[in-house]
Amino acid sequence: MNMKLRNIPFSPPDMTEMEAQEVREAILSGWITTGPRTKKLEREISAFLHTEKTVCLNSATAAMEMVLHLLGVGPGDEVIVPAYTYTATASVTQHVGAKLVMVDSQKDCVEMDYDQLAEAITEKTKVVVPVDLGGIVCDYDRVFEIVEQKKHLFRPSNALQAKIGRIVVAADCAHAFGASRKGKMAGEIADFSSFSFHAVKNFTTAEGGALTWHLHFGDEKVEPTPIPSLKGRETGTDVRTVSGYHGIPYVEGETWNELLYRLSQLFSLHGQNKDALAKTKLGAWEYDIIGPWYKCNMTDIMAALGLVQMERYPQLLARRKEIIQRYDEGLKDLNVKVLNHYGNDHQGSMS
């Protein structure tokens, strides 16, 4: 019997005239780099994921590395990642000079082996990176149980690590935008979560990503650390910073959520203490370079796509669910094991 083969393209982006129009408006607005559309998208993502803050960046890779910089992870530290993941999950650890520790998967499962995770933790372990593969949220209850059990081994090296008080859980949610488990969205479960908006994802800005965090102390005020060797130019008093962030000035009354957002802006804009939008305000053109950091911000053209995708996202997820149900039905009698995207306590993002 002759069968006609049909080409099914791999995850083409779902774009409409709405996205095209929003991008056109962004281009003609005269504001195409990080600006009002990017800030609006950050607010919408925070509301959608129930997180304190969102920082939009150029990739999930940038977001994952940003977490390590915020935590001060570097040489002498260890970061645990699952062996079954994309290269970026592992490569960002190499970028900061920390030691990469890989944990194998469970048998017949895409999640990491949590017993092996517990065995892999040492006094040098600073971060565990669970991966929500295929948009299915990991068993974070088990992950947090393990890091709490190993709390006595934790040795913090900056103020943020000390405030968290245990090994940090930094989720790779590249596939999991819109997924949930036990009533909580990916993004409000782990301490930090990194999302991808790459062209093949079910929510896309062509290239792009986002970093979110969910910390119980986010609204608490940050305590400063005096640096006696440095004096303020005008007051002559000791310059104050935050432990682990040498050279970054302390801001009176700043909360942890505000500090982490400010640090993320610095780390993603060459250490520039004002973004392009802030510099447009009257008399605010002058800025300082605080440190030699990176360039990985999102642009308003990318954010324009994201704003329309956010509006359409419930329909995009519903359509993917229909397609998955058709695959599940077609494969059920063929002895083919498929991922369980839906259950009593979880809903995947079908990424």
Segments (PLM) and residue ranges:
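Conserved PLP-binding active-site segment in aminotransferase class I/II-type PLP enzymes
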Residues: 1-70, 74, 143-144, 255
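Short glycine- and hydrophobic/aromatic-rich loop-to-beta-strand nucleating segment
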Residues: 194-195, 204, 209-212, 303-305
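Short mixed-charge
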Residues: 148-167, 220-226, 236, 241-252
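Glycine-biased, low-complexity coil/linker segments
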Residues: 231-234
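Conserved active-site segment immediately N-terminal to the catalytic lysine
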Residues: 157-204, 285-289
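PLP-dependent aminotransferase-like
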Residues: 69-173, 180
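PLP-dependent aminotransferase class I/II
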Residues: 39-43, 51-52, 127-131, 136, ...
